[in-house]
UniProtKB/Swiss-Prot annotation:
PANTHER family: CYTOCHROME C OXIDASE ASSEMBLY FACTOR 7. Belongs to the hcp beta-lactamase family. GO terms for molecular function: protein-disulfide reductase activity. This is Cytochrome c oxidase assembly factor 7. Required for assembly of mitochondrial respiratory chain complex I and complex IV. Disulfide bonds: none annotated. Sel1-like repeats lie at residues 34-66, 68-104, 108-146, 147-183, 184-219. Interacts with CHCHD4/MIA40 through transient intermolecular disulfide bonds. The keyword Transport does not apply. SUPFAM superfamilies: HCP-like. The modification N-acetylalanine is found at residue 2.
Length: 231
């Protein structure tokens, strides 16, 4: 069939991959297509395993084109020092913030990471956690259905901190949302709150339902990590 590549033929595969690289470069740098640049990154990572070059394309596509998913991936590169970049959490935070503010497949995860870095505090000027900023970005991510953000919010309101008072109503609200999204410990925490009447009306029946959900999620998680067996 005309145009089909025989992937058993080494020469055809080599030619196909070379053409793909040329095409990706053309779309990125000649047609100024941000999605084309991101496809070039996929090619460099997945086919060439050239992470240094991928980092350069990501920097270009994030800084020049404000491409959300490129900013997210560049942030991840900065977190680990991948692609020849110097490990830099502040640079990572800036990248995640750009990704959070622009629509993209990774926008919600980027908002969570902004919250996470603000919560950790290393990227802040005083080196201390910025709980207000963490709350704001966790909330954005949680509203987008990001489970870990909902759980982190529940923990923040459950524990409280100087300048960040406890709020058991909100702790319960976010525990329930994280539980609905499948977070085991959120279900367990919500169950305990209802069992003890800790900040909410005591409801042992609801506590039991939540405990059972936590146990079911735990069983499902255990099934997911069972080793393969051959009989």
């Amino acid at each position: 069939m005309a145009g089909m590549v025989d992937f058993q033929d080494e020469e055809q595969v080599k030619s196909f991959l070379e053409n793909m690289e040329v095409e990706c470069n053309y779309h990125c740098y000649h047609e100024k297509d941000p999605d084309g640049c991101y496809r070039l990154v996929d090619y460099l990572e997945g086919i060439r395993k050239n992470f240094d070059e991928a980092a350069k394309v990501l920097k270009f596509n994030c800084e020049e084109n404000q491409h959300s998913d490129s900013c997210y991936k560049l942030g991840a590169y900065y977190v680990t020092g991948k692609g020849g970049l110097t490990q830099d959490l502040k640079a990572a935070a800036r990248c995640f913030l750009m990704a959070c503010e622009k629509p993209g497949k990774k926008s919600i995860a980027a908002c969570h990471n902004v919250g996470l870095l603000a919560h950790d505090g290393q990227v802040n000027e005083d080196g201390q956690p910025d709980l207000g900023k963490a709350r704001d970005y966790y909330t954005r991510a949680c509203d987008g259905g990001y489970t870990s953000s909902c759980f982190n919010l529940s923990a923040m309101f459950l524990q409280g901190a100087p300048g960040f008072p406890k709020d058991m109503d909100l702790a319960c609200k976010y525990s329930m949302k994280a539980c609905d999204l499948g977070h085991i410990w959120a279900c367990a925490n919500a169950s305990r709150m209802y069992k003890l009447g800790d900040g909410v009306d005591k409801d042992e029946a609801k506590a039991e339902v939540l405990k059972n959900r936590a146990q079911q999620l735990h069983k499902e998680q255990q099934k997911g990590v069972q080793p393969l067996t051959f009989g």
